[in-house]
C-alpha cells in the first residue's frame, strides 16, 4: 500500500490494484492544427502537460500500475458519432466545426487520421491497454469497467485532456461505479478558459474524488531510494 498526498485528504491505494488512465492525449486535443485548436480553443499550454504525463506514466509503469490510454473519436463516416437524434451530434464541437467548415469533413477525430492519433511523445508499450471511446466518458460503450473489475482494480489515477470534459466525465462515472478517482492536476488541461480547470478540480475534490500532483504521485509510487535520487 502507498499513501498519496492529495486534496481534500491523502488517499491510500495498492499499486497492483490501481490504473493510470491517460485520457485523449491525441493531436486533436494537444497539438496545433488539431480539433481543439481549429475549434478556437487555446492549446498553447499543452506541452508541459504532455511532459508531466510522460513522467507519470514512467513512474506508474515502474511501480506495476496498469496504464490505460483512451482515444476519443469515431469512424470516418461519423456513424458512431450519432445523427441528429443524438445530443452528441448537436453538442460535439468537432462535429459543429466540420459543419461550419465543410473542407474539414472527415478529418477531425476520425479513426486512422492524424487528429485521432496520440501525440508523438506518448507511446503505449506492450502490456498497456488502448481503448477507443465514442463519447466523453470512458465508461460509455467501452469494456473499461469489466477490464478493471477482472483485474481487481479499484483506484484510478487520471491524466489527460480535457479536465472539464472527458477527464471529469470518466471520473464521475467511475465514482458512480464505486471506483476511487484521483486527478493529477498538472497532468491535465482544460478546454476553455482557466476557470473551467479550476471548476472541474473543485468539483472533483469536493464531490467525486481527490486531486494530487505528478511529483507527489511519483514520490508515492517510487522506491525510497529512487525517490531520494529524484
Swiss-Prot record:
Protein role: Hydrolyzes ureidoacrylate to form aminoacrylate and carbamate. The carbamate hydrolyzes spontaneously, thereby releasing one of the nitrogen atoms of the pyrimidine ring as ammonia and one of its carbon atoms as CO2.
Organism: Enterobacter sp. (strain 638)
Catalytic activity, reaction form: (Z)-3-ureidoacrylate + H2O + H(+) = (Z)-3-aminoacrylate + NH4(+) + CO2; (Z)-3-ureidoacrylate + H2O = (Z)-3-aminoacrylate + carbamate + H(+); (Z)-2-methylureidoacrylate + H2O + H(+) = (Z)-2-methylaminoacrylate + NH4(+) + CO2
CDD domains hit by this protein: cysteine_hydrolases
GO biological process, one term: nitrogen utilization
Entry protein name: Ureidoacrylate amidohydrolase RutB
Active-site positions on this chain: 24 (proton acceptor), 133, 166 (nucleophile)
Family, similarity comment: Belongs to the isochorismatase family. RutB subfamily.
Alphabetical list of HAMAP family matching this protein: RutB
Cross-referenced PANTHER family: ISOCHORISMATASE-LIKE DOMAIN-CONTAINING PROTEIN, PEROXYUREIDOACRYLATE/UREIDOACRYLATE AMIDOHYDROLASE-RELATED
UniProt-listed Enzyme Commission number(s): 3.5.1.110
Class of enzymatic activity (EC top level): hydrolase
GO molecular function, one term: hydrolase activity, acting on carbon-nitrogen (but not peptide) bonds, in linear amides
Keyword Hydrolase: yes
Keywords assigned: Hydrolase
